[in-house]
Amino acid sequence: MPDAVQAPYPAYRPEPNMQTITIAPPKRSWFSLLSWAVVLAVLVVSWQGAEMAPLTLIKDGGNMATFAADFFPPDFSQWQDYLTEMAVTLQIAVWGTALAVVLSIPFGLMSAENLVPWWVYQPVRRLMDACRAINEMVFAMLFVVAVGLGPFAGVLACWRCLSTPPACSPSCFPKRWKRLSPARWKAFAPPVPTSSKRSSTACCHR
C-alpha cells in the first residue's frame, strides 16, 4: 500500500472582518528627556576624572603587541616545576571550593526568612552584602598579611572569590530554602522520650 501523501498546509489568509491595530509610539515626557540629559552630563564630567585617552591607546597600541610577543615561543625547560605548581594550584582550588560550599550552608540557613526570625536573617544578609561589596583584592591583601604569601593565602582568596558568584554564594541558598517548609527540619530534632510525653499528659489532665 503506497504511503499517503500529506497535503501541504494552506497559506494563511486573514479574515475579511479582521482589523489592523496600530500602536501609537510612546510619548517622550520631560522627565525622560531630563534623565537622559543628566546621564550625558555625568558622562561628560567623568571624562576628565577617568583620564579617558583613546588617542593614546591608538598611538601606543603597538606596545601591547610587543609585550604579547615575548610570551612566544614558550620555554618548557623547567617543566617539572611547572607541573608541581599546577598541582599546587589544583589543590588550592579544591580546598577553596570546599570551604566555600561548607561555609555557605550555615550562612544560607541563617539567611532564610522561613527558617529563622528576622533579627537573625537580616544581620546575616547585611554581612554577606558587605562581604560582596568589598573587592577581592582587599581580602587577598588581608589574608597575605595574616598568613603570609603562600598556598594558604591562595586558598582563602579562592574561597572569597567562589563565595561571590551564585554557584556557591550563601545568598543563593535562601532563595531555594524559602520554598521549604519548616516542618521538614523536624526530622533532625531529637525524639522526645515516651515517659516525658506521659508525664506531661498526666499533668495536663490534673
From Swiss-Prot:
Subcellular localization: Cell inner membrane
Name listed for the protein in its UniProt record: Putative cryptic phosphonate transport system permease protein PhnE1
A Gene Ontology biological process term: transmembrane transport
Complexes and interactors: If the reading frame is restored, the complex is composed of two ATP-binding proteins (PhnC), two transmembrane proteins (PhnE) and a solute-binding protein (PhnD).
Keyword vocabulary terms for this entry: Cell inner membrane, Cell membrane, Membrane, Phosphonate transport, Transmembrane, Transmembrane helix, Transport
UniProt signal peptide: none
Cellular component, GO annotation: plasma membrane
Cross-referenced CDD domains: TM_PBP2
Bilayer-crossing regions: 30-50, 92-112, 137-157
Protein purpose: N-terminal fragment of the PhnE protein, part of a phosphonate usage operon that is cryptic in K12 strains. Growth of K12 strains on phosphonate can be observed when it is used as the sole phosphorus source after a 60 hour lag period, suggesting the operon is activated. An intact PhnE in strain B is (AC A0A140NFA3). Part of the binding-protein-dependent transport system for phosphonates; probably responsible for the translocation of the substrate across the membrane.
Membrane topology: Multi-pass membrane protein
Coiled coil ranges: none
Source species: Escherichia coli (strain K12)
Protein's gene: phnE1
